[in-house]
Amino acid sequence: FIQLAEQPEMRFVISNTTEAGIVFDPSCQPDDAPASSYPGKLTQLLYHRFKTFNGDKNKGLIIFPCELIFLNGHKLKETIYQYIDLWQLGEAFKTWFEEACGVYATLVDRIVPGFPRKEIDTIKDKLQYNDNLVVQAEIFHLWVIEAPQEISREFPADKAGLNVLFVPSEAPYHERKVTLLNGPHTVLSPVAFLSGINIVREACQDEVIGKYIRKVMFEELMETLNLPKAELEPVSYTHLRAHETLRHL
């Protein structure tokens, strides 16, 4: 993988190594092939690129970690600095990393149950070919990137019709997601479980429990957020529609 660093046109690194992926493992060494941790691998890649292009600041990389960690970019950057110091990669490389590269915090918001095992035969009949890479996901999607607006000109995902926002701070969107998506799940779980319902869709479609979860979302959880209701209500309705159509625990 290290040869990727030698490609002059390379510009972006996007990762999702799960919540456990951004960790500092002091046992990683600079000559590991490759390092076992993701931040270790990334530091190796960046250092090889730095040496390949003799510290050219036009060859820096823009890095978007998508791991579900609040301020994931800050955590990843902090971990890279730890490897720079541990491996004694030098002040010149550290300066290049600081000035030529950008590590930006992101927030991804989309329910992705994964491979639709129960519906795959119907899907294959519709497609008229076998596709074992089918992934089921809700229609709603949001990718918040805490980065300057000029980065959006290099990464114009919104021009492709994707709901990608470049914002000064991801914090309000993180709070919104935790409150309106994760919050209802937390409230719903014990009530549905004790009622003999294990699937979110079935709980939302239940006459009593469905009414209960709507009341919690719109009359209680939403009131705790310091954001305009005009912005919050469409998001809440979208999450509800997803819960009512996707089969997930």
Features from the language model and the residues they span:
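Substrate/ligand-engaging "lid" and interaction regions
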Residues: 1-241, 247
